[in-house]
Amino acid sequence: SRGLGDVYKRQDPNNIPEDSPVAIANISDQRMTIVTTDPTKRYYYTLVFNDKYRVKIATRNVNIPGIQNFRDMGGYPSYPTKKRVRWGMLYRSAQIDSLECYSRRELKNIGIKTIIDLRSESELRGHTPLQQGFNVIHVPIKTGDMEDILKGIQEQKIKSDTVYRMVERMNRELVMNYHKEYRQIFDILLNSTNYPVVIHCSSGKGRTGIASALILASLGVNSDIIMEDYRLSNDYFNIPSASSYAYNLPARSQEAITTIYSAREDFLNAAKEEIERRYGDVDTYLQRAIGLTKEEIKKLQSILLVKND
């Protein structure tokens, strides 16, 4: 392709004036470098090609010290609506507990208002809660098996292939046993005053992965893109830092721990197959199991989707 690409940036994804570009490059270069001087600020960019075609982009991962796997769920296309998920509205992450002041400032800088914590009461014990200033809503989804699995791995009683089957079973149970909890999450998201929202559990992979998949599905994002989003946890969750004790375990046990913290396609597919077996498809599940009306789904889409530029 020939021509020029202009880049404009702003902290507000809904208001990026095209007055003074921060960078201009030949489209044929297929790349450009933009240096930001303040790492605590998050920027969104509009790329304008030949003064005609526009696309809004941002980094998906948000680097906040003390929080793993923190990422923006914006930008994904919703083909049925011909729209995209809004940037800067909906985030997902691993556990959020007490943070240093600069990390809290970064959360404030991206505007986080509501934090949905999916961890169980037993998981919260021993963790110092996040300081005041955020609306933290607990929607506990218990994965009792997880603690037993980790204990079994440490005692070298459970192997990697056994863990694989257990996580698949756990994901099937997640979509069948927690309809009320998912309904509560959707109720929070249906209130436009709660945004921006971040959803998290312990690793930001299992329960958060299922919840995020259901939300994206309700917005009309297709299954391939939902899987792509799910698998990003493999890039942004640091397993060694979450399981430092594993260094003292034999290789087989380390492999089992890697399995339990990984976002494998089979794990999300297990949940999807269970939904399809019981309800036929995800849309029917959202309506019959979770109780979302078509009007509520349209309302959620009006909040979280935006027209393509």
Which residues fall in each region the model found?
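Cys-dependent protein tyrosine phosphatase-like superfamily
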Residues: 1-2, 6-198, 211-309
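Ser/Thr-glycine-rich phosphate-binding loops at phosphate-binding pockets of nucleotides
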Residues: 203, 207-208
